[in-house]
């Protein structure tokens, strides 16, 4: 059949279209120059990286190595991959922050909306001559000398796939696995509103390149330590549904994690259970880190902009999925978050 309108050939293109061509050309230029001169290229991603951040950085690293380059992939300590991401290809490219060259010519930063999200690697933004930012967050500060930023892209790996194509590197099964992991992570296995025709076109290319999609899905969503089941039950039993904004929230503290024998990264999926409450428009899960701080994950079903509220609290992300760090307890943290939601709603009403 013929496609028209939203399903036209342009809409079905897998290449993100909102990055200026000059930025693509600059990105390819500095990366290929580094390959030709055998200079190491540092590939970094945000603290506590997820499948999109790690998938993008590792896929780019594999592509640069295939082109003859010297990629070094890193993120802020502790450099420990979540168990759910232990299958990612290219882990031999990982290098600790303190072993990185102090004045790299090129640093590429993936899925990171602001310098502070680099944590212990924030110095790269000043130390590198060329800083390439590859990101799809609407809250991105575009802190690079070159910025491949497109909030319309369903994942950072969508942009990374385009970059690898432009570098002229064929997709191996390993590269495709890392790219696909980022794509399904940030589209919620193609459930979220960010999923586009282009996302499905990219998925088809990745499957054709050798991705074992059933294995990836099983590792990402269907494999948990037994202790997770008890912890999930505890977190759900204390969930609260409150307020005119129909917000459902719960928390996981250090005692929960220690009792279950889990790391904080391993309880990220709880937000996807909490958000299913039919009565709730917004979901929040607070998870206590080893230093006493709380990682706060937020989700919206569509009406509420949680990204802007999180940005006001020092975090960021997307309109419907975002997060921030808090040093106060869960109840006070959720109260501050709700206050920001109320302020945003009031400001929106005043502007109408």
Task: Pin down the residues of each PLM region.
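Short glycine/serine/threonine-rich phosphate/pyrophosphate-binding segments
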Residues: 51-57, 82, 115-119
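Hydrophobic helix-and-loop "lid/oligomerization" segment in the mid-to-C-terminal part
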Residues: 2-45, 55-83, 101-104, 185-352
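Hydrophobic/aromatic beta-strand patches that form the interior of the parallel beta-sheet core
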Residues: 72, 106-108, 130-134, 146-149, ...
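Short alpha-helices
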Residues: 134-202
